[in-house]
Swiss-Prot record:
<keyword id="KW-0963">Cytoplasm</keyword>
<keyword id="KW-0915">Sodium</keyword>
<dbReference type="GO" id="GO:0004298">
    <property type="term" value="F:threonine-type endopeptidase activity"/>
</dbReference>
<keyword id="KW-0645">Protease</keyword>
<comment type="function">
    <text>Protease subunit of a proteasome-like degradation complex believed to be a general protein degrading machinery.</text>
</comment>
<dbReference type="Pfam" id="PF00227">
    <property type="entry name" value="Proteasome"/>
</dbReference>
<dbReference type="GO" id="GO:0005737">
    <property type="term" value="C:cytoplasm"/>
</dbReference>
<comment type="subunit">
    <text>A double ring-shaped homohexamer of HslV is capped on each side by a ring-shaped HslU homohexamer. The assembly of the HslU/HslV complex is dependent on binding of ATP.</text>
</comment>
<feature type="binding site">
    <location>
        <position position="160"/>
    </location>
    <ligand>
        <name>Na(+)</name>
    </ligand>
</feature>
<dbReference type="GO" id="GO:0046872">
    <property type="term" value="F:metal ion binding"/>
</dbReference>
<protein>
    <recommendedName>
        <fullName>ATP-dependent protease subunit HslV</fullName>
        <ecNumber>3.4.25.2</ecNumber>
    </recommendedName>
</protein>
<dbReference type="InterPro" id="IPR022281">
    <property type="entry name" value="ATP-dep_Prtase_HsIV_su"/>
</dbReference>
<keyword id="KW-0378">Hydrolase</keyword>
<dbReference type="GO" id="GO:0051603">
    <property type="term" value="P:proteolysis involved in protein catabolic process"/>
</dbReference>
<keyword id="KW-0479">Metal-binding</keyword>
<feature type="active site">
    <location>
        <position position="2"/>
    </location>
</feature>
<feature type="binding site">
    <location>
        <position position="163"/>
    </location>
    <ligand>
        <name>Na(+)</name>
    </ligand>
</feature>
Length: 185
């Protein structure tokens, strides 16, 4: 599978992923890009699961973003509705992590749209390792979002055989006006 991690801290949101594509117990590719920018570079998205399935979902999600003028939550809910009700989509095996300036969401194949706790998402085979590492770093350091995501992926890559150390990291800056009251850059 893979590991995707998203961290939101201060004025940044990051989604990062490794590059390993496995077929059974064989590594087929080590430098896949599982993290992308969508909707005029305003939305970050990463996937865990089947590569072909994820590309189908990326296309569908981007069309929902266009339809809803970039509104992340509306696009995610509409994609999840389609995923639940469309026979072909229901067969797709992937999970998406998406984020923009305002929200971070997980979209599952069961049709769930989840807003994570602690502004942290970790999905895929190494997700539990990355999540534990990122929580520890969020609670005990002042590291920025990118560094936390990178370190969490490195730890997951050291433990999970389906996660490697070839990372793709995308980052969005959150304008000061979009930050919660009392938060600073």
């Amino acid at each position: 599978m893979t590991t995707i991690v998203s961290v939101r801290r201060n004025n940044k949101v990051v989604i990062a992923g490794d590059g390993q594509v496995s077929l059974g117990n064989t590594v087929m590719k080590g430098n896949a890009r599982k993290v992308r920018r969508l909707y005029n570079n305003k939305v970050l998205a990463g996937f865990a699961g089947g590569t072909a399935d994820a590309f189908t979902l990326f296309e569908r999600f981007e069309s929902k973003l266009q339809m809803h003028q970039g509104h992340l939550t509306k696009a995610a809910v509409e994609l999840a509705k389609d995923w639940r009700s469309d026979r072909a989509l229901r067969r797709l095996e992937a999970i998406l992590a998406v984020a923009d300036e305002t929200a971070s969401l997980i979209i599952t194949g069961n049709g769930d749209v989840l807003q994570p706790e602690h502004d942290l998402i970790a999905i895929g085979s190494g997700g539990n390792y990355a999540q534990a590492a990122a929580i520890a770093l969020l609670e005990n350091t002042e590291l920025d979002a990118r560094t936390i995501a990178e370190k969490a992926l490195n730890i997951a890559g050291d433990i999970c055989v389906f996660t490697n150390h070839h990372h793709t990291i995308e980052e969005l800056e959150i304008p000061q006006a979009m930050l919660p009251q009392g938060a600073s850059a």
